[in-house]
């Protein structure tokens, strides 16, 4: 009897250890994805939501078999650095970097953790990869490079009397610098006059907008994070001067721009999420994953803004009015 009791105790102890071991392995198997987002605005939020949905659609759900740590830097470089340091010290399994400054921050902290980016215009110019075809770094992802020439063509169709086009952008954002250069070429190729005003932060946006409306018949805004967050400010100035504003993406149009032919950022984020699934499943590594781009572009026209500035939308564009 005594031997039987001892056997039961020993068997119980073994079972406890086995169960504890299984629990430990289960906890260890839950991979952590850190999301570092540069700033909060419609486009970047949509990209994040699309990314998470793609994971969920493929069986990766936050709190179940993965852990997602989402951090927003609120357009602050010191916040970006702090968040990046935290992700590295916590040894997360993967990072989603939303917008160029976020990707540059985390990529500058680690060469080991896989990084996927989204809402990034030019990975090569941002020094995140060696080439779009074969990154050869721990970074890959999706690009939000716009059809800039076609956006300038849209401006001309909506504002045919425009002679001078002003481009407003943030001089500290590599993605905006690249887009401004492309826009300049497209504008001048049409025989129009190009002018520009730059800002370094959101506090300068109102004054910069007041400056550019004095010399431009219409304004072009690239996909610029500072400007996307300050669209209501830009709208407040341009609606008074009745200056049309063509934007780089639909979220900017929804918040006060006139029109765009732009990317669906939710779809872009979703595509990035599908890339993440490949990495999580060990089927691919960022170093050999080509940068992917949007599969299509959508027209979006803000009818309320058109009415406010007295602009008549051509009949062949009325189907694209979103509000």
Please identify what each model-predicted range represents.
Residues 168, 174-249:
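Pocket-lining segment of extracytoplasmic ligand-binding domains
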Residues 33-52, 58, 69-78, 172-176, ...:
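Extracytoplasmic "Venus flytrap"
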Residues 123-164, 263-284:
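Hydrophobic alpha-helical segments within soluble ligand-binding/sensing domains
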Residues 67-89, 198-212:
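Structural motif
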Residues 33, 51, 140-187, 289-305:
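An alpha-beta-alpha
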Residues 73-130, 221-248:
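Beta-alpha junction/loop-to-helix N-cap segments that form part of ligand/metal-binding clefts
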Residues 278-323:
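Hinge/cleft segment of the Venus flytrap/periplasmic-binding protein
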Residues 1-32, 57, 61:
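Short, low-complexity disordered leader/linker segments with a strong preference
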